Amino acid sequence: MSDRLTLLRPDDWHIHLRDGAALANTVGDAARTFGRAIVMPNLVPPVRNAAEADAYRQRILAARPAASRFEPLMVLYLTDRTSAEEIRTAKASGFVHAAKLYPAGATTNSDSGVTRIDNVFAALEAMAEVGMPLLVHGEVTRAEVDVFDREKQFIDEHLRRVVERFPTLKVVFEHITTGDAAQFVREAPANVGATITAHHLLYNRNHMLVGGIRPHFYCLPILKRNTHQEALLDAAVSGNPKFFLGTDSAPHARHAKEAACGCAGCYTAYAAIELYAEAFEQRNALDKLEGFASLHGPDFYGLPRNTDRITLVREQWQAPASLPFGDFDVVPLRAGETLRWKLLEAEA
């Protein structure tokens, strides 16, 4: 078993960098490992057009560490009022790479999201025409649907219809959490892919709920039962190019997580590739990590692969108990625990 693993530099195809003072921390954590990242647009107010995307992009670039070549790939936030013209303008910008469908109320800062899928059909048609991928938070939000069933329900009620109606539209089913989602993506046409988080590969709902409620495991879509975790691992290590890395690293200040009504999100960017390495090692599949982390994503998006490399070494180190997060602190996933892989260096 090798104690050293060298990969083409990976990208993160789903990350939350937040805004304001927090960028000084989140951008550096992402840039430590990733060449590029698809940056989620669910700010307050959200990133709804190319001008807002450019302003946010400039704030991210200003927070890059010295000499970093990290590239933020910007995303529009779809609303009921997003027009086909806004899609075309965003595509022409060269820096907006996708548009994100949040069902209204599904997750953090999604109140401005789409209330009915049909309301964005004109935008989706324009996206298909110009070659802009649709990123989907795949959960229904009706109160009568159990939180553990909302992903499967979204597939049956909405996603199948979107894929059938727009056969040339690239669709990324983001942060999939169920065997149902993995099967849907496998069986869908080649224009449908999915991201998988490290925390959904490493953990299931027992880790969050057994022996006490652990708020730093709470995320949306929520962790599912262990059989779904195993199905996600099967997909990630399969070598199927439809599945690729997306951390959904989503920081919240400690007081917003450790609360009577805590926020959803796990902060993993500080050690993302190390966490994925642990998951792949569980399946004796470290040879599949480069495809998942570095190749499948850019290939799906039609972007060039990175050419520089990173190196991981098998070395135990202790995750920090907390990290700075603007004016506050954030408790990262695995805080205070031992990690088994460590990012060593970048190679030209």
Curated annotation (Swiss-Prot):
EC number: 3.5.2.3
Ion transport among keywords: no
InterPro entries on file: Amidohydro-rel, DHOdimr, Dihydroorotase_CS, Metal_Hydrolase
Residues with N6-carboxylysine modification: K100
Signal peptide span: none
Cofactor: Zn(2+)
SUPFAM superfamilies to which the protein is assigned, alphabetical: Metallo-dependent hydrolases (SSF51556)
Pathway(s) per entry: Pyrimidine metabolism; UMP biosynthesis via de novo pathway; (S)-dihydroorotate from bicarbonate: step 3/3
Binding site for substrate: H16, L17, R18, N42, H137, L220, H252, A264
Keyword Zinc: yes
Entry's Gene Ontology BP terms: 'de novo' pyrimidine nucleobase biosynthetic process; 'de novo' UMP biosynthetic process
Record-given protein name: Dihydroorotase
NCBIfam families assigned to the protein according to its UniProt record, in alphabetical order: pyrC_dimer
Binding residues annotated for Zn(2+) 2, in chain numbering: K100, H137, H175
Residues that, per the record, bind Zn(2+) 1: H14, H16, K100, D248
Recorded catalytic activity of this chain's protein: (S)-dihydroorotate + H2O = N-carbamoyl-L-aspartate + H(+)
Keywords per UniProt: Hydrolase, Metal-binding, Pyrimidine biosynthesis, Zinc
Entry function: Catalyzes the reversible cyclization of carbamoyl aspartate to dihydroorotate.
Subunit structure: Homodimer.
